[in-house]
Amino acid sequence: MKLIIEETTEKMSESALQIVLGEMMQDKQVNISLTSGRSPEKMYEMMVPAIKGKAKYKDVQYWLFDENPYDGDEYGPNWYDMQKMIFGPAEIEDERVHHLTRENYTEYDEQVRRAGGIDVMVIGLGWDGHFCGNCPRCTPFDSLTYRFLYTDKQKLNPTYKDRPTQPYTYTMGPQSLMRVRRLVMIVNGSEKAEIQKRFIEEPINEDVPATILKLHPNLTVIADRDAATLLNPDGYENI
């Protein structure tokens, strides 16, 4: 694992974007997977003008790694958020955006494999240590893509809000992410300082499921200074 601490969220976003654009420049079909949420907002602001209308990125395929579909709808909030933050502004056609559904989740990993595998994935670190849709105390560490009944997840994580119109979570599991060639985690904000410290310092455990990702052979963690306030990089022998 490589740990990079940048002074600001903007610098963190620039570093992550450089990695993503570097992977996108490969002379082949490139497959990337990007996160929704707050952490990547600045990165997407920078990414839109960098890729919009650029022919050299026309073969890039985008894969969403989790979803909570609404009843009666093929899509969920992650799809809509990504359309708003990056796919719409960058004018990326729906045909190049692949997403998890009720029908395809059991075949999603095989679809990714047939497409050539994910070249780079950018994820965030959840406030409780979750990653993608893999949440505390209910993440099967040996699983590829799977679905989980949301009410069961909520029983194990009582602070989670009710989602009566979103009965299931569909997510790429830990073993799906282990197949990604380059994994980038971005972490920003002082509210993430405690969970960032736990992720770095604790052994692999179900209470902080993201700790399993430290086994990935090519993981880069990029944090801003606020998220890294509790870290002492000089004291980490294994980073």
Each language-model region and where it sits:
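N-terminal glycine-/serine-/threonine-rich phosphate-binding loop
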Residues: 1-32
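Glycine-rich beta-strand-to-loop/alpha-helix junction loops that act as flexible
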Residues: 34-39, 123-127, 188
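Ligand-binding beta-strand-loop-alpha-helix segment within the catalytic cores
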Residues: 55-122, 235
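Active-site histidine-anchored catalytic micro-motif
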Residues: 58-73, 117, 131, 140-144, ...
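Class I SAM-dependent methyltransferase SAM-binding "motif I" and its flanking Rossmann-like core
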Residues: 127-175
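ATP/nucleoside-binding phosphotransfer catalytic cores, i.e., glycine-rich phosphate-binding loops
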Residues: 180-239
